[in-house]
Amino acid sequence: MGDLEENKRMVVEYYELAFNEHKPEEAVEKYLGSEYIQHNPQAPDGPEAFIAFVKAFPEMSVDIRRVIAEGDLVVTHGVVKFTADDRGTVAVDFFRLEDGKVVEHWDVLQPWPEESANPHPMF
């Protein structure tokens, strides 16, 4: 299961390295398990598929605003931008860790709306 703070640190570093530093191969080598189960219906399983996804969006960036950990799960809440001028997509990602590696991923994505029915910010 590992230390919760260490698990949180690892997941944040994994996303920083992959999406903000644009080094998906290094991120996979350091943080991803050899078996990587993907629950997003638009993304295939496996480390190679993750690398291909990141490379398909060379301007992509992730701004993680919250990180929560419990047991072998880490949850992030943040903003994904696929291009520099993208308005952004709010993302909630769940990661399952095993033996210090990310082995499973779920996500829920919501485009950042131009208008809101209430005065509350997304974060």
Residue ranges of predicted features:
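C-terminal and inter-domain tail/linker signature
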Residues: 1-123
